[in-house]
C-alpha cells in the first residue's frame, strides 16, 4: 500500500511538471515554477555536499544553445526596433523546464533506484490517462468541476466558453502536443522494448493507455491526432506489417491489439 501511494505521489509530481497549473491562492506561481525552484535548491544542496556541480557534455551543449538563441533573439529585437522580447528570455524558460525535470528524475531515482526512459514513459502514460479521465469527470459532474475550478487556476473560463474538455493543467494545443509525444513513446516501448513485448500485461497496459489517450486526448485537443498518426506509422514501419509479414516477436502484440480492437468496436 505504501509503495502504491508513493508511486501515486511521484505521478502527481510528473503531472505537475508535464501539465503545469496554478492554485487559486497563488495564481502567478504554477507547479512547474515551484518544481524548478526546488530543483535549483536540490542542485545547490548536492553541489555543496560534493563540493562541485557537474554537467554532461550533452546538457552543456543544450545550455550554450539556449543562451545563443536568446542572444540572437535580443539582437533581432533590437535591430528591428520591436518591443516584443518574448524569446529573449528563452534561457529562463529553458532553466525552468530543466529544474523541474531534475526534480522529476530525482524522485523517480529515489524510489526506484534509477531513472530510466522506460520508467519516465510509464509515469507519463499514467499521467496522461489520468488527465483524460479527469477531463471526462470534470465535464460530466458539475460538483467535481466546481471543486476543481475553486482551487485550480488555469484559465478554465475560456475553456468553458469555447466548450472544450480540460483536465488539471491539460487543455487545448499544449496538452495535444504532450499527448502526442507520449503516444509516440508508448509505441516505441511496444516496438523496441523486449521486456514489454514479452509480458502480456505490460503490452495490454501500453495499448490501453494508447487507446485512451488517442480517443479522449483528441476530444481535449485535436493536435493529439498528430501523435496518433505518427505512432501508427512508427508501428507499421517497425513491425513490417506493410510487407504483409508479421515477425514472430510481434505476434503477441498484434494478438492483444486485435482483441482490444474487437472489444472497443463492439
Predicted feature locations:
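N-terminal signal-anchor transmembrane segment
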Residues: 1-49, 71-77
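Membrane-interfacial loop-to-transmembrane alpha-helix junctions, especially the N-terminal start
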Residues: 1-9, 51-66, 116-123, 200-205
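A membrane-periplasm/extracellular boundary helix in multi-pass inner-membrane enzymes
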Residues: 139, 236-266
Amino acid at each position: 500500500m505504501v509503495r502504491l501511494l508513493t508511486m501515486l505521489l511521484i505521478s502527481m509530481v510528473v503531472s505537475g511538471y508535464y501539465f503545469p497549473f496554478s492554485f487559486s491562492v497563488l495564481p502567478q506561481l504554477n507547479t512547474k515554477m515551484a518544481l524548478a525552484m526546488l530543483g535549483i535548491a536540490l542542485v545547490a544542496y548536492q553541489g555543496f555536499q560534493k563540493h562541485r556541480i557537474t554537467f554532461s557534455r550533452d546538457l552543456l551543449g543544450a545550455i550554450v544553445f539556449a543562451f545563443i538563441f536568446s542572444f540572437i533573439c535580443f539582437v533581432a529585437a533590437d535591430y528591428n526596433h520591436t518591443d516584443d522580447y518574448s524569446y529573449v528570455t528563452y534561457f529562463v524558460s529553458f532553466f525552468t523546464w530543466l529544474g523541474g525535470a531534475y526534480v522529476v528524475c530525482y524522485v523517480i531515482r529515489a524510489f526506484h533506484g534509477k531513472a530510466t526512459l522506460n520508467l519516465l514513459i510509464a509515469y507519463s502514460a499514467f499521467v496522461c490517462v489520468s488527465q483524460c479521465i479527469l477531463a471526462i469527470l470534470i465535464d460530466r459532474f458539475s460538483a467535481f468541476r466546481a471543486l476543481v475550478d475553486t482551487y485550480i487556476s488555469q484559465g478554465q473560463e475560456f475553456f468553458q466558453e469555447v466548450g472544450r474538455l480540460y483536465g488539471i493543467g491539460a487543455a487545448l494545443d499544449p496538452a495535444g502536443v504532450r499527448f502526442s509525444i507520449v503516444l509516440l513513446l508508448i509505441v516505441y516501448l511496444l516496438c523496441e522494448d523486449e521486456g514489454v513485448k514479452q509480458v502480456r500485461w505490460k503490452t495490454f497496459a501500453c495499448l490501453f493507455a494508447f487507446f485512451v489517450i488517442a480517443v479522449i486526448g483528441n476530444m481535449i485537443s485535436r493536435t493529439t491526432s498528430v501523435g496518433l498518426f505518427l505512432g501508427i506509422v512508427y508501428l507499421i514501419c517497425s513491425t513490417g506489417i506493410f510487407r504483409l509479414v508479421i515477425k514472430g516477436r510481434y505476434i503477441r502484440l498484434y494478438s492483444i491489439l486485435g482483441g482490444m480492437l474487437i472489444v472497443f468496436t463492439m
